[in-house]
């Protein structure tokens, strides 16, 4: 049985050793928590621990390691195992990171439901599966929620906390505090909705981007520049609502000034794209000019992206609002 918070307040289990699981393990260790990293195959666990060691050493060398502990101290907090009951013993938080498959996740939470007690939080990393489906029928449903990270989690701190309709307020509060403790930026989604908040905003943006390319209003390359050299720069520091507030004499002033224009433009938005066919091929070819789609080029570009995000995160930490 998972022990109570009072006896082992520093125990966390991460179930799944892929990219998201490894990232969670590193984040929890950066906060001083003992972490058990579980996967069904011991070989997977061993490989994940090796990868974590290499990544932590590189982060320390570049001055980007999170937390007050050194890399070796953090690595000493992370252990691996391939026995689920052993992994969750002595923990107060379990972070599920298995592939985004509803049936697979339901099976895992059904197993966990049988071996935990009333003190542990059961948290899923799902990016879009609704808590009401993930946790349906569980005895410990009041202890369940989704804590959706953003890829790559180590460099992008946002975490969406999404409750099941029966999730206890204390579960949300505990998880919110835990995320803050490990340096993440949790947001409370007050009730479940398909796509949560981040993906609803992301898909709205992608949908209009696709329509603009399909209508030959802008090229795929220039479309990306609109975000990377335009909206994205200010959105890295302030959100769309604060942008509105600052771009006039406050929010009410902005709405008075621009509401009719916004409504006029919004009425011209087209139907949901199919994301296939000739337009998909056109966008693919444009992206391949910038980044060929072979593993070597994609991996190098991801590394560059992660390095940029790491430097941006450091800058944001240095630039505090007035």
UniProtKB/Swiss-Prot annotation:
The record's function comment reads: Has high L-gulonate 3-dehydrogenase activity. It also exhibits low dehydrogenase activity toward L-3-hydroxybutyrate (HBA) and L-threonate.
- Residues that bind NAD(+): 19-20, 39, 100, 105
Q: Which GO terms describe its biological process?
A: fatty acid metabolic process
Reaction(s) the record says it catalyses: L-gulonate + NAD(+) = 3-dehydro-L-gulonate + NADH + H(+)
Residues with the Phosphoserine modification: 6
Which superkingdom is the protein from?
A: Eukaryota
Name the enzyme's class.
oxidoreductase
GO: which molecular function terms? L-gulonate 3-dehydrogenase activity; NAD+ binding
Q: Which is an annotated Pfam family here?
A: 3HCDH_N
Among InterPro entries, the record links this protein to:
3-OHacyl-CoA_DH, 3-OHacyl-CoA_DH_NAD-bd, 3HC_DH_C, 6-PGluconate_DH-like_C_sf, 6PGD_dom2, NAD(P)-bd_dom_sf
Q: Where in the cell is it found?
A: Cytoplasm
How is this protein's activity kept under control? Inhibited by malonate.
- Entry EC number(s): 1.1.1.45
Organism, by scientific name, is Sus scrofa (Pig)
Please identify the protein, giving its name as recorded: Lambda-crystallin homolog
Gene encoding it? CRYL1
């Amino acid at each position: 049985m998972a022990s109570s918070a009072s006896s082992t307040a520093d125990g966390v289990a991460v179930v799944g050793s892929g990219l998201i699981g490894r990232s969670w393990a590193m984040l929890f260790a950066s906060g001083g928590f003992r972490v058990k990293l579980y996967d069904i195959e011991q070989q997977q666990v061993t490989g994940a621990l090796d990868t974590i060691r290499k990544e932590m050493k590189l982060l320390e060398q570049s001055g980007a390691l999170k937390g007050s502990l050194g890399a070796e101290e953090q690595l000493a907090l992370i252990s691996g195992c391939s026995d689920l009951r052993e992994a969750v013993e002595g923990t107060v938080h379990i972070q599920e990171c298995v592939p985004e498959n509803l049936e697979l996740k339901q099976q895992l939470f059904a197993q966990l439901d049988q071996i935990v007690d009333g003190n542990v939080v059961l948290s899923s990393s799902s990016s879009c599966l609704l808590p009401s489906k993930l946790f349906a029928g569980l005895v410990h449903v009041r202890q369940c929620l989704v804590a959706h990270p953003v890829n790559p989690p180590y460099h992008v701190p946002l975490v969406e906390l999404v409750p099941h309709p029966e999730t206890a307020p204390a579960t949300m509060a505990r998880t919110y505090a835990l995320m803050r403790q490990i340096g993440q930026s949790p947001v409370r989604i007050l009730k479940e909705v398909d796509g949560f908040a981040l993906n609803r905003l992301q898909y709205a943006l992608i949908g209009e981007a696709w329509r603009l390319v399909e209508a030959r209003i802008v090229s795929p390359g220039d479309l990306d520049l609109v975000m990377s050299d335009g909206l994205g720069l200010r959105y890295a520091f302030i959100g769309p609502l604060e942008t509105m507030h600052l771009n006039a004499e406050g929010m009410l002033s902005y709405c008075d000034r621009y509401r009719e224009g916004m409504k006029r433009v919004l009425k011209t938005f087209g139907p949901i794209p199919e994301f296939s066919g000739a337009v998909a091929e056109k966008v693919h070819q444009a992206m391949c000019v910038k980044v060929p789609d072979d593993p070597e080029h994609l991996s190098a570009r991801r590394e560059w992206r992660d390095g940029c995000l790491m430097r941006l995160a450091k800058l944001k930490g240095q630039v505090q609002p007035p």
